[in-house]
Amino acid sequence: MTHDGTWSDESDWEAVEFELDEAAHAPPAPVVAVVGRPNVGKSTLVNRILGRREAVVQDVPGVTRDRVSYDALWTGRRFVVQDTGGWEPDAKGLQQLVAEQASVAMRTADAVILVVDALVGATTADEAAARILLRSGKPVFLAANKVDSDKAEADAAMLWSLGLGEPHPISAMHGRGVADLLDEVLAALPEVSEVAPRPGGPRRVALVGKPNVGKSSLLNKLAGDQRSVVHDVAGTTVDPVDSLIELGDRVWRFVDTAGLRRKVGQASGHEFYASVRTHSAIDAAEVVIVLIDASAPLTEQDQRVLSMVIEAGRALVLAFNKWDLVDEDRRELLEREIDRELVQLRWAQRVNISAKTGRAVAKLVPAMETALASWDTRIATGPLNSWLKEVVAATPPPVRGGKQPRILFATQAAARPPTFVLFTTGFLEAGYRRFLERRLREAFGFEGTPIRINVRVREKRGARRR
């Protein structure tokens, strides 16, 4: 290392780049879904598996959240935990919702843990979920929760009646039996996820948005008017999942179209479950079309869906539907309003359409192609650091704690979405990272894709020796 704190040769950077490249190209980790009725301890079990308090722990009415998947590590193996809890219980719709939960888990997970309250015993909702999971052909593990003593294990034994094999007595709250359960789950998991989308084949598109925004109408317009549906692909015994549609001389795979075509019942909790399906579709997609009602003000629900797409790191197309309902003299004003409200998403591809009349629907294809090309983009290390040197020389990072952090080196760690790592001598303020993102877009494009900028602060030499 030289006197100014930079590395004297490139070997350190090459080692880090190799490490990042390995991580970026790692095969998708297997997925374990945790399902069950409210109040049985799903989120507590997820937290226990993660070893940190991250999932919501009260499955009580009104407790919902957007994020449902977490990276986990057990005995050196990476896997993903999918928490499907969080919807509001209601006696009328409970069985239907647990069954729906199990159905989604069958499609999106490599193995399933069904959590049952051993003190309550098997309910009709538990039985409905068990029947669906048995048909999946996937490894299913029955976690008999709230077994806090040897005496309570007798309650767990009663759950043999569900037909899922031996119940695993656990206490998610205190950790009892969870390690043994995880050992068995991981032994049954494939090394690489069998449900993760495979590279190659038609590009995968998710069509998402709040209820009644016109998703089904747009899907039917894309498929029906052009008579271009190739076929529906059977995903499970429950419903067909994807549709292959030919648009613009290529075939696109629209994911989870079953969720669009089937009307969700009015049972309590269906709005949360729509959120789970939205997550499922976004996770399976490469590019996401978010439908927004142009004839009504932007809602919190619209913003929440957009946040899901950004967090998932998917290419994005904004489709403002029902544009035909907007008065001609108001359209320019509305465009400016949208610019103001979505100022952080100026990079997104935007198309004003009418799913009903077909207005501008054809423009969705070039928008998707542009977004995906940006999503796939990689910038070589040399040009990236030349650009960075010029930007930092003109506008250095702000002083923090009396010291000015220096950016030593940058590399693109991954594409899909483009992810950059900056090696620095100190923390970079969020505002400066946003500034760098804007400049990155000005220099290299990236229309239609989120960009991630991560910072690695160099350790002090004394700290490293200790």
Curated annotation (Swiss-Prot):
- Coiled-coil ranges from the UniProt annotation: none
Ordered alphabetically, the record's keywords are: GTP-binding, Nucleotide-binding, Repeat, Ribosome biogenesis
**Does the keyword section mention GTP-binding?**
yes
- Annotated binding of GTP 1, by residue: 36-43, 83-87, 145-148
Source species, domain of life: Bacteria
Keyword check for Methyltransferase? no
Give GO MF terms, alphabetically. Answer: ATP hydrolysis activity; GTP binding; ribosome binding
> Could you tell me which SUPFAM superfamilies the record lists for this protein?
P-loop containing nucleoside triphosphate hydrolases
Instruction: Extract the PROSITE patterns matched here.
Output: G_ENGA
- Provide the residue positions that the database annotates as binding GTP 2: 209-216, 256-260, 321-324
Please list the residue ranges annotated as the KH-like domain.
Answer: 377-459
One GO BP annotation is: ribosome biogenesis
The EngA-type G domain covers which part of the protein? 30-193, 203-376
Q: Which Gene3D superfamilies match?
A: 3.30.300.20, P-loop containing nucleotide triphosphate hydrolases (3.40.50.300)
Subunit comment: Associates with the 50S ribosomal subunit.
**Protein role:** GTPase that plays an essential role in the late steps of ribosome biogenesis.
Family stated for the protein in its record: Belongs to the TRAFAC class TrmE-Era-EngA-EngB-Septin-like GTPase superfamily. EngA (Der) GTPase family.
Q: This protein is called what?
A: GTPase Der
Q: What's the source species for this entry? A: Mycolicibacterium paratuberculosis (strain ATCC BAA-968 / K-10)
